[in-house]
């Protein structure tokens, strides 16, 4: 828990872009409130909130992300997840950058008490146009998974454990502006190690409403290659969000 709180604190104070898309502004980002439906290890409706901020100063940039989702049915908790990440980037040229990144996640319905990653890598802006941007990242780091205790049957109990490994991180960020008010994004994250591979893909359609206010619908799919005993490999979430654009 201390490590997770440290990751949250870093994400809240450390803010910037892994993928420079438009000419940088000093502060940019977004805050969002969402409601949705989750299926997989839990079947529930839930609500959530998220904050993304980035700050640039010359060739340096810091970014942070904090998000959480919570659900309850008939008084029983059905979803409780929090994620935090912080990243520092150094812009080598207008397309190439180097970065350091830390992240932490706690999901009560994943089979893990907590998961952490810290690493470094290189980012490259493949497409950099007014209406289309595509950025890639890749790097290596250290991955820690705290596996929760599992009771498989009345007579079989698997104690909690900690798995530590070298991890390879990759990410893709794609954005296409359909017109002045509508944008399509496709974000993919992969974290590979010899113990497991985590994959996440989020496709979203965002529409400008008025001023800095936006509406968004998104589909989020997560896959765990080696889930703990008794847990499913794939979770999906469909979300409807109200977004306030910063900067």
Predicted regions mapped to residue ranges:
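Residue-level signature of outer-membrane beta-barrel architecture
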Residues: 22, 35-37, 53-55, 90, ...
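Transmembrane beta-strand segments of Gram-negative outer membrane beta-barrel proteins
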Residues: 23-37, 60-64, 184-186
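Repeated loop/turn-to-beta-strand initiation elements of outer-membrane beta-barrel proteins
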Residues: 59-63, 95-98, 130-134, 178-184, ...
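Membrane-embedded beta-strand positions of outer-membrane beta-barrel proteins
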Residues: 31-33, 64-66, 100, 120, ...
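Residues that define the transmembrane beta-barrel architecture of outer-membrane proteins
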Residues: 27, 43-47, 78-82, 114-118, ...
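Solvent-exposed loop/turn segments connecting transmembrane beta-strands
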Residues: 37-45, 73-79, 106-114, 191-199, ...
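Outer-membrane beta-barrel "beta-signal"
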Residues: 119, 205-212, 234-247
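Transmembrane beta-strands of outer-membrane beta-barrel pores
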Residues: 35-39, 57, 68-72, 102-108, ...
């Amino acid at each position: 828990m201390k490590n997770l709180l440290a990751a949250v604190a870093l994400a809240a104070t450390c803010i910037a872009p892994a993928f420079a898309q438009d000419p940088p502004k000093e502060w940019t980002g977004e805050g969002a409130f969402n409601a949705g439906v989750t299926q997989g290890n839990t079947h529930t409706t839930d609500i959530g909130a998220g904050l993304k901020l980035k700050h640039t100063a010359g060739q340096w940039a810091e970014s942070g992300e904090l998000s959480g989702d919570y659900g309850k049915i008939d008084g029983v908790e059905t979803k409780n997840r929090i994620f935090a990440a912080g990243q520092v980037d150094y812009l080598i040229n207008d397309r190439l950058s180097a970065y350091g990144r830390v992240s932490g996640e706690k999901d009560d319905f994943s089979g893990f008490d907590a998961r952490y990653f810290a690493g470094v890598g290189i980012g490259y802006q493949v497409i950099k146009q007014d209406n289309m941007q595509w950025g890639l990242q890749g790097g290596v780091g250290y991955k820690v998974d705290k596996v929760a205790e599992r009771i498989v049957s009345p007579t079989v109990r698997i104690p909690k454990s900690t798995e530590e490994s070298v991890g390879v991180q990759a990410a893709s960020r794609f954005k296409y502006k359909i017109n002045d008010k509508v944008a399509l994004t496709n974000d993919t994250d992969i974290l590979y190690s010899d113990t497991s591979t985590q994959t996440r893909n989020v496709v979203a359609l965002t529409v400008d409403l008025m001023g800095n206010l936006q509406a968004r619908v998104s589909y989020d799919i997560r896959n765990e290659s080696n889930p703990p005993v008794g847990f499913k490999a794939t979770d999906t979430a469909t979300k409807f969000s109200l977004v306030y654009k910063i900067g």
